[in-house]
Structures are given as C-alpha cells and as structure tokens.
Design a protein with these regions (language model features):
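Residue-level detector of Asp-centered blade-edge/turn motifs that repeat once per structural unit
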Residues: 66-69, 107-110, 149-152, 196-199, ...
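Blade-level signature of beta-propeller repeat domains, shared across WD40, Kelch, NHL, RCC1
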Residues: 314-346
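Conserved beta-strand positions in repeat-built beta-propeller and related beta-rich domains
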Residues: 72-78, 113-119, 155-161, 202-208, ...
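Short loop/turn segments that connect beta-strands within beta-propeller blades
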Residues: 85-89, 126-131, 168-172, 215-220, ...
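Beta-rich catalytic cores
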Residues: 60, 78, 101, 119, ...
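Beta-strand-rich domains and repeat architectures in extracellular enzymes and scaffolds
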Residues: 53-80
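Surface loop/turn motifs at the tips and blade-to-blade linkers of beta-strand repeat domains
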Residues: 53-57, 94-98, 136-140, 177-186, ...
Length: 346
C-alpha cells in the first residue's frame, strides 16, 4: 500500500447561516433583497464556500450531478420530487412517485437527469423541460446502487437484487450477472458503484466480494481483487486518463486502479465515513467524509481535507463541474459549493 502524504485545511467554527426562501407556484425562490443571499456568500467567500438551504425542513438531498450547462441536479430522499439548482435558485421538479434511496444519478448529453428509485422499482428520466419518463423493472422488489450514462446514451446501474450490473437503452433492460444469485446479504456480491469509461467499458464495485468488476463493450467480464480485505467498497469514478478511483469505506481508504494494479491512500481522519466520489477535470479525486464533516481531495498522492463551514454538516453526495467547482449534498438540508480557486489550493 502506498501511504498518502497528508495536508489538512480547516476553516474553523462558524455560525449557522440562513438562506431565506419561499415557495411561489411550486417554484422555490431565493430572497435576494437585503443581506439574505448576499450575506451568505460574503460571509464565507474568503473560505470559498457557498451553501444553499433546502426550502423545507424535511428535504434530504442525496446524490448530486452537474449538467454541461451548469445545472446542478440532486435527488431527494422520501420526496416526490427531484431538485435542481440554477442561477442560485433551487427548484423542485415533481416526479409523481416518492423516492426511496435514490442513490444513482447522472445526466446525459442532452441534459436530462436519470436516477434510481427503489420504491417505484424504476429508472426515471427527467428532461430539461421537466418531462418525466419512468422505466419499470421486472422484479417485485428492487435494491439499486449507483448509476452512470455512457457516451452512446446507455444507462448503466447496479442492481443487487439480481446480482447484476444492468444496462438500459432504447427502453430495453439487459442484465450482466456479476455473481451467484442468492439472497441480498453477505452471500450476495453486492454490486454498488458504477462508472463507464470513454471506451464504453463499464466498471463496478462488488461490495461483499471485495472486488472491482470490468465489463467490456463485447460483454467480456473480469474481476480484480482489492488488496485490503473486507475494505467495504463503495462509490467509484473514472478520470481523464482512464484510471479507476474507488472508495474503501470500511478501510477508510481511497484507491486508484490503473495498469492492472491498485494504489491505496489512507484517509487521515479515522472512521471518516466515506460516502461518495467524483473526479475533477483537473484530475483530482474528491470524496465526502460524512462523519468528519469534511470533503477530501487526492492529488499527486497527497490527501487534503477541507472542513465544512457548519459543525453539524453531513456531506453525502459530491460532483465537480466543468470549471472544477466542487458541489456536495448535505443530509441536514443543504447544497454546497467549494469554489474552484479554493479547491485547487488548500
């Protein structure tokens, strides 16, 4: 294992800021008058953070992704809507079905958002104009992991219920079995993270098998054993050079797989609670530390941690936009952004 050099960035303790919002005609509107939004941005600008409060106390943002046009999409737990943030304004787009564990979220080339909904047993698409289309799964029960969209428009997602990594294209599902069919539990390999590289090869983490799976465009499958036993594999992402980054949540590590070998980097904060991973255009790998109230970055073998402004923060999802701004969801009811200028430093 390659130990990581460590850097820490702390922003101290802050009071809980407020972004005042109201609902008009079903659309959430931010009050920009006075010191509302301006005060929030100004107060944290020196540390590079901006955060947006959810309109309702019951709103729990989960997964997050950024479209090419800069729209920030995010899923909401136990809600009949998906959220989006544009020009500093949060909107909730109704879906007609309540979400349960909407962990998978991605956007396609046309700007439509795709997400998983275990309760509805479906994969759902929301177009930029708000049109909703759902594709029901055939199983009576669904347990779903992450989701990714390939360059050809195919939607790939983890389906532990059927021990499969599944493709949805042109309304048709095709399952690629990655382990023996058995009850979802310790005997199930538990596919969870999914990502597609530019060549169309699909990568997935098999949580209980402690392996990284590869599915090539011709259907050939292979698996690679992770060096640390019982590492608790989670999210994964592909960088611009084709290297695979993955979280070892149980081992408190971030790993990189390239050229047939793994490198592992230990997170300096013990038991940090690693939940999500994203790779920036500049090549840095970013991850969330739910229990530590931090974001983490791996760059050139160095881990840098960024403490979030609020001491009660619970960062869960993460994404990086085309300008290298880092976006994250906070289960306590916030969407946050770490500015690219600050994200590059630390």
């Amino acid at each position: 294992m390659r130990p990581a050099r460590i850097r820490r960035t702390s922003f101290g303790r802050f009071r809980n800021p407020r972004l005042w919002l109201f609902v008009a005609g079903g659309i959430v509107v931010a009050l920009a008058a006075g010191a509302g939004v301006t005060g929030l941005i100004g107060r944290w600008a020196r540390w590079g953070f901006v955060e947006f409060k959810m309109p309702n106390r019951t709103d729990i943002p989960v997964a997050v992704v950024v479209a090419r046009d800069g729209t920030v999409w995010f899923t909401l737990e136990a809600s009949d809507a998906v959220g989006r943030l544009r020009n500093g304004v949060i909107q909730k787009v109704g879906t007609g079905r309540e979400n349960l564990e909407p962990l998978g979220l991605a956007v396609d080339a046309e700007g439509s958002a795709w997400y998983t909904n275990a309760r509805a047993r479906s994969i759902t698409r929301i177009s930029a104009d708000g049109a909703v289309t759902s594709f029901p799964l055939s199983t009576p029960v669904a347990r779903l992991g992450r989701l990714s969209v390939a360059a050809d428009g195919a939607v790939w997602f983890a389906e532990p219920t059927t021990v499969s990594v599944t493709r949805l294209k042109d309304g048709v599902f095709m399952r690629y079995t990655v382990g023996p069919l058995s009850p979802v539990g310790s005997s199930n390999v538990g596919p969870f993270g999914v990502a597609v590289d530019p060549q169309g090869t699909v990568w997935a983490t098999l949580q209980n098998a402690n392996k990284l799976a590869r599915i090539r465009p011709d259907g050939e499958m292979a698996v690679f054993e992770v060096p640390t036993p019982r590492s608790g594999l989670g999210d994964l992402a592909v960088d611009g050079r084709g290297a695979i980054w993955l979280l070892e949540s149980g081992a408190n590590k971030v790993a990189r797989f390239a050229g047939g070998r793994f490198e592992e980097f230990s997170v300096p904060t013990p038991n940090a609670g690693l939940t999500a991973l994203a790779v920036a255009p500049d090549g840095a790998a970013w991850f969330t530390e739910l229990r530590a109230h931090k974001l983490g970055r791996v760059r050139d073998g160095i881990i840098t941690e960024f403490t979030l402004p609020r001491s009660d923060a619970r960062p869960f999802g993460i994404a990086v936009d085309a300008r290298n701004n880092v976006w994250y969801t906070d289960l306590s009811g916030w969407i946050g952004r770490l500015a690219a200028e600050r994200a590059r430093g630390g």
